[in-house]
Amino acid sequence: MMVTVVSNYCQLSQTQLSQTFAEKFTVTEELLQSLKKTALSGDEESIELLHNIALGYDEFGKKAEDILYHIVRNPTNDTLSIIKLIKNACLKLYNLAHTATKHPLKSHDSDNLLFKKLFSPSKLMAIIGEDIPLISEKQSLSKVLLNDKNNELSDGTNFWDKNRQLTTDEIACYLKKIAANAKNTQVNYPTDFYLPNSNSTYLEVALNDNIKSDPSWPKEVQLFPINTGGHWILVSLQKIVNEKNNTQQIKCIIFNSLRALGHEKENSLKRIINSFNSFNCDPTRETPNNKNITDHLTEPEIIFLHADLQQYLSQSCGAFVCMAAQEVIEQMESNSDSAPYTLLKNYADRFKKYSAEEQYEIDFQHRLENRNCYLDKYGDANINHYYRNLEIKNSHPKNRASSKRVS
C-alpha cells in the first residue's frame, strides 16, 4: 500500500484539506489487524492510517477507533511510547480540523465540518482531551463529549475528572447494557425527581401509567434511578404474590449512597408508594379485559437503605446507582427468589469493608466501563446513521479510508 506524506497540514485551506483526503482505498478486517500489529510495533504511518480510518462513520471506522482507544486505555511499559504517538496524532487531527475550518468547537456545527468525530461524542475526542493542558479547552470539549441536552453540566465540568458526577445519559447507557438480557429485572430510564414546574414526580407518573396499561404490573423487579436534585438514588419496586391466600404486597427499597435523604424526599416517596398501593387495592378498578381486581394487597413495605458509602467518593452517587443496580440484576438472574433489600444491603456492607484505596480503584474502574458504554452508544448510532444514508441513496456500503498521513 502506497502512503503519501503531506506536511504542514495546519496551513491547508478547507479545499486543500478535502483534496488531501480524496484518495481512497478499501478497508478490510485483515488490513485493520495488520495496521494494529504494525502500530503496536511503533510504526507511525500505521498509527496515522488507523486515525484516518477512525474518522469514518462505518463499522471499520468504529473498529479503528476502538483499536486506538483500547491501546491508550490499557497502558503497559511496552506501549507507553506508542500511546504518546497515538495522542500526538489525535492532537494533530484536532488542530488540523480547527485551524482549517476556522470554527470554534460547537457540536451543532458538526454537519458542515470535515472531521465530524472531532466535533461530537467519540473515543477520538476522549483521547484528544486527556492531554490538552488548557482547563478552559477541556471544559469546552467536555460540553461536546457529554452532549448536555438536559443542561446538567456546570461551566466547570471536566469529562476527564475522576470524581465528577455522572450524567443522566451516561447512567442510562450503562444500565441499558447490563440489563439488556435480564429476565427478572427491568431498569427504567433515569429521571429527575419532580416534573418541571410541578409537585408531581416522574415516579408516580411511571407507576400510574404502567398499572393502568397492565393491572398485573410489575411482574419483574423494577429499578428506577432518580436524581433528587444533585444526588442519585435507586428505587427498587417489587410485587410479591401469595397465591395460597390470594394476597399481594408491594415491597419498595430506596437505596441511597449517602447517610440521609431528607424528610421531604422521604415523605414524598412514601406518599407515592402508598398511593400506588391504594390504586392497586381499589376493588372497583377494572382491567382492560373488564375483569375486576380480586387479589387483596396488604400494606406496602417501604425501606430506606441509607448506605453511607461516599466518605471518600463525594461525587459518585451515580456510579453507586449503576453498581448497585448491576448487583441486583446479576444476582436476580442467578436466583430469581433473591430479595432486592438483601442484595443491596450485602453490596453496601461488602463495599464498606474495602480500604479507601480499594474504593477509589473500584470507582475508577467502574467509571472507565461506564465511559466505554457511553461512547459506544454514539459509535453505534453513527454506524446505523451511516448505513441508513447509504440505503436511502440505494448504494451498497463501501468502507473506505484515506491513504494520506495525518502528520
From Swiss-Prot:
It comes from the Bacteria. Pfam families: ElaD_SseL-like_N (PF22103), Peptidase_C48 (PF02902). GO terms for molecular function: cysteine-type peptidase activity. GO terms for biological process: proteolysis. Keywords: Hydrolase, Protease, Thiol protease. InterPro entries: ElaD/SseL-like_N, Papain-like_cys_pep_sf, Peptidase_C48_C. Its EC number is 3.4.22.-. The active site is at 231, 317 (nucleophile). Protease that can act as an efficient and specific deubiquitinating enzyme in vitro. Does not possess desumoylating and deneddylating activities. The physiological substrate is unknown. Belongs to the peptidase C79 family. This is Protease ElaD. It comes from Escherichia coli O157:H7.
